[in-house]
A protein has these predicted regions:
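Rossmann-like NAD(P)(H) cofactor-binding subdomain of soluble oxidoreductases
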Residues: 103-174
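Glycine-rich, N-terminal phosphate-binding loop of Rossmann-like dinucleotide-binding domains
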Residues: 97-99, 139, 193
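Short acidic low-complexity segments
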Residues: 76-91
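NAD(P)+-binding Rossmann beta1-loop-alpha1 motif at the extreme N-terminus of oxidoreductases
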Residues: 1-59
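N-terminal glycine-rich dinucleotide-binding loop that anchors FAD/FMN and/or NAD(P) in oxidoreductases
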Residues: 52-80
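N-terminal Rossmann-like NAD(P)+-binding domain of SDR-like oxidoreductases, especially those catalyzing
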Residues: 6-8, 15-17, 21-22, 42, ...
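Internal alpha-helical scaffold of NAD(P)-dependent oxidoreductase catalytic cores
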Residues: 152-169, 174, 179-204
Length: 204
């Protein structure tokens, strides 16, 4: 897959190390690393992360070996940036959605995730037909959620899985204090509703 731009929605403990590593990792065919843009919604509690990243600083607290240097080097090289504007997703080849999902009682709480996907879907509607960007949900989802919730949500915006977008799920497990190590070295489970999607997710 010829990936030139990746958008990472949510610079938390999953999204930030993924964005940093992707921005310095050459493709398997030897082509340069993709340009990576981190998308963080403007909010009183998290909006500051955009300025921090654009200044070359990781917004993740605590000691995370290697992360600060990777972020600083990638920003200095012009391969990593951050924005509040979800429309940065509109020309991305791959969109990684790394928004935390919690529980409300025994049921999963998808409010923040769906809010993020609303912005992603609005942005992707601007793309030319047939470009089929890959949208990978890195959040933890209950079984069948891609089929019963995510795909119908995108369809409401006229984005049909397999035709207009390729929807995939690849939940990430991380460990504070070892974020870079876990993201770089852990095996990944990849899934999608369309038969092509797992192959594309694995290659992204």
């Amino acid at each position: 897959m010829n990936t030139k731009k990746i958008a990472v929605v949510g610079p938390g403990i999953v999204g930030m190390p993924m964005a940093a590593l992707l921005s310095v990792s050459p493709a398997t065919d030897g082509s340069p690393p993709p340009r990576v843009v981190v998308v963080q919604r403007k909010s009183p509690t998290s909006g500051w992360k955009v300025d921090a990243i654009n200044e070359g600083r990781s917004p993740i607290g605590g000691v995370e070996p290697g992360l600060d240097k990777i972020v600083a080097d990638a920003v200095a090289a012009g391969r990593l940036s951050a924005t509040h504007d979800t429309y940065a997703c509109s020309d991305a080849d791959v969109v990684l959605v790394c928004v935390q999902t919690d529980k409300s009682g025994l049921a999963p709480e998808y409010g923040p995730l769906m809010e993020a996907l609303d912005g992603v879907a609005l942005a992707l509607r601007k793309r030319p037909p047939g470009t089929r960007p890959l949208v990978i949900i890195e959040s933890t989802l209950a079984p069948s959620t891609m089929h019963s919730v995510i795909a119908p949500f995108f369809a409401k915006y006229g984005l049909i899985d397999g035709r207009d977008v390729m929807l995939g799920n690849s939940p990430n497990r991380v460990m504070p204090g070892r974020l870079v190590e876990r993201v770089a070295q852990s095996d990944k489970l990849v899934a999608g509703l369309h038969p092509e999607t797992p192959v594309l997710v694995a290659a992204a």
